[in-house]
Regions:
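Fold-core signature of tandem repeat domains
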Residues: 5, 12-14, 21-24, 30-32, ...
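N-linked glycosylation sites
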Residues: 62, 204, 259-262, 274, ...
Length: 446
C-alpha cells in the first residue's frame, strides 16, 4: 500500500509498500522493511532507517539526525546540511549535495558499503573497514580514508583527502586543496595541476603527472612522481623520493636528511640544500645529465662538468669546487662560493638585483669564455645594480668580461679585481647606460 503524512512527530513503519512524509520533526523516525520505499521531503528529526533491499529518499536533511542504510539497501539524500548518512553491510548511499555542513557527521561508509557524494562543499566523508567512497566534485570539506577503506575524488578544487592507517586514496584531477598521506596509507594523484600532496609517517604517495603544485615528502614517507613536468617535489628530513622522472619545467628540492633513489633526469631543475656529499663529479648537459643543478645554504658540489646545454646555479650559501665549464652556463648569486674553475667556452653569469660582491677563489683558468656581470633587467633609463668581482688568480686567454658602465655620469660601474694573473689576452665589453639612453659621451673618461 501507499501512505502519506504531511507533518509528522512520531514513527512511520513501511513494510513492502511506499510511505512518504512531508516534514518530519522532533523524535520522529521512518523505518523501511521488506522491499519498501520511504520518502521524506524534509528531515528535522531522529532518523530514516533503510533495511535490506529497501529504498530511502530524503530531499533535505537539516538536523543532526541519521539516514541509516544497510544490508544491500539504497539511500539518497538530495541536500544534506546537517546530520549523517550512514552506510554499512553492503548498502549503497548517495548525497547529491553536501552543503554548509555543521561538521557533525556527513557520510560514513564501512563494511563493504558504497558511498557517493556528487558535489561536496563542506563537511566530511569518512570511509573505513572495506567501504568504498567517491566524491565527484569537491570544493571543500574532507574525505577521510582509514583502515582498509578506499576513497576516490574525481575532481578536487579545494578541501582535503586524508589517508592513513592502511587506507587507499585516489584523486583523478587535483586543481587545489590537498591529499595528506601518513601511517601506512597509500595515495595517488593522477594529474596534479595545483595544491599539495603531503607524504609522511610511513605513507606512500604517487603523482602520475605533475603540471603544477607540490609534493612534500618527509618523516619516513615515500613519494614518486612519474612525470614531473611542472611544480615542485620537496624532499626533507626522513623522506625519500623514489623512481621520480624529472622533466623540463619541473623542480626537485632536496633538503638535508632527505633521500633520492633512482631518479631519472630528462630536464628541469634540482636544488640541493645543506647537502655536502652525493653530488660530486656530475656531468651536466651534453653527454651527461640534462638538468639544472641549484646549490644553496651550505650545499656543495665538487668536480662538476658542465657541457653545452647544462647549467649550474650557485645560490646564497652554496659552494662549487673544481668545476669544469665546457660550453654550458654557471649562474652565481651573491653569497655563493666558487673555488678552482676551468672554463673552455661557456658562460659565467653573475646575478644580483641589488648588486653585490663576488669572489672566485683559487685559480680561474678561462679560455674563450664569457663572464657576464651585466644587469639583464636594465634596457634603458634605470640605473643598473653594479657588481664587483674579485679573482684570486686568472689564467688562460680569449675570455670576454661584460660589464655595466655609465661613462657619461661616471657615477659607478661594474668592477673586476684580479689579484694574480698569468700572461694572456682577455677582453672587456661594456653595456653603457649613457648609450642606452642615447646620451653622447665625449672626452676622456676613467
Amino acid at each position: 500500500g501507499t501512505g502519506k503524512v504531511e507533518t509528522m512527530d512520531g514513527l512511520q513503519y513501511i513494510s513492502g509498500g511506499v510511505g512518504s512524509v512531508g516534514t518530519m520533526n522532533g523524535n520522529a523516525g521512518q523505518f523501511i522493511y521488506s522491499g519498501g520505499t520511504g520518502m521524506i521531503n524534509e528531515l528535522n528529526s531522529y532518523q530514516q532507517y533503510v533495511n535490506e533491499g529497501c529504498t530511502g529518499i530524503i530531499n533535505i536533511m537539516n538536523t543532526t539526525g541519521t539516514q541509516w542504510i544497510s544490508a544491500n539497501a539504497v539511500g539518497t539524500v538530495v541536500t544534506l546540511k546537517s546530520g549523517t548518512q550512514l552506510i554499512d553491510d553492503g548498502g549503497t548511499g548517495t548525497i547529491i549535495t553536501l552543503d554548509n555542513h555543521d561538521g557533525a557527521g556527513g557520510q560514513i561508509v564501512y563494511s563493504n558499503a558504497i558511498g557517493t557524494i556528487v558535489t561536496m562543499l563542506d563537511g566530511e566523508q569518512y570511509v573505513f573497514k572495506g567501504g568504498s567512497a567517491t566524491v565527484v566534485d569537491m570544493s571543500g570539506g574532507t574525505q577521510i580514508v582509514r583502515v582498509s577503506g578506499n576513497g576516490m575524488i574525481e575532481t578536487l578544487n579545494d578541501g582535503e583527502q586524508n589517508i592513513m592507517g592502511g587506507g587507499t586514496g585516489l584523486v583523478s584531477t587535483m586543481n587545489s586543496g590537498s591529499q595528506v598521506i601518513s601511517s601506512s596509507g597509500t595515495g595517488t594523484v593522477d594529474t596534479l595541476n595545483g595544491g599539495t600532496q603531503t607524504v609522511a609517517g610511513g605513507g606512500n604517495g604517487t603523482v602520475s603527472t605533475m603540471l603544477g603544485g607540490t609534493q612534500v615528502v618527509s618523516s619516513s614517507g615515500k613519494g614518486t612522481v612519474n612525470a614531473l613536468n611542472g611544480g615542485t617535489q620537496i624532499v626533507s628530513v626522513g623522506g625519500t623520493s623514489l623512481d621520480t622522472v624529472l622533466n623540463s619545467g619541473g623542480t626537485v628540492y632536496l633538503g638535508s636528511g632527505g633521500n633520492i633513489s633512482n631518479i631519472t633526469y630528462s630536464g628541469g631543475m634540482q636544488i640541493i640544500d645543506n647537502i655536502t656529499s652525493g653530488y660530486d663529479n656530475m656531468t651536466l648537459g651534453s653527454g651527461g645529465t640534462n638538468v639544472t643543478m641549484g646549490i644553496i645554504s651550505g650545499a656543495q658540489m665538487s668536480g662538476t662538468i658542465i657541457n653545452s646545454g647544462g647549467e649550474q646555479l650557485i645560490l646564497n650559501g652554496g659552494t662549487a669546487l673544481d668545476t669544469e665549464l665546457n660550453g654550458g652556463i654557471m649562474q652565481m648569486s651573491s653569497g655563493g662560493i666558487v673555488s678552482g674553475m676551468t672554463m673552455t667556452g661557456g658562460s659565467m653569469v653573475l646575478e644580483n638585483i641589488d648588486g653585490g660582491s663576488f669572489n672566485i677563489n683559487g685559480t680561474l683558468t678561462a679560455n674563450n669564455a664569457v663572464i657576464d656581470m651585466t644587469d639583464s633587467s636594465v634596457t634603458r633609463a634605470g640605473t643598473p645594480a653594479y657588481e664587483s668581482l674579485t679573482i684570486d688568480t686568472l689564467s688562460g686567454s680569449g675570455t670576454t668580461f661584460i660589464l655595466d658602465t655609465d661613462l657619461a655620469g661616471e657615477a659607478n660601474s661594474d668592477k673586476v679585481t684580479i689579484t694574480h694573473a698569468d700572461v694572456g689576452t682577455h677582453y672587456v665589453q661594456i653595456k653603457d647606460l649613457s648609450k642606452l639612453n642615447n646620451i653622447e659621451v665625449t672626452g676622456e673618461h676613467k
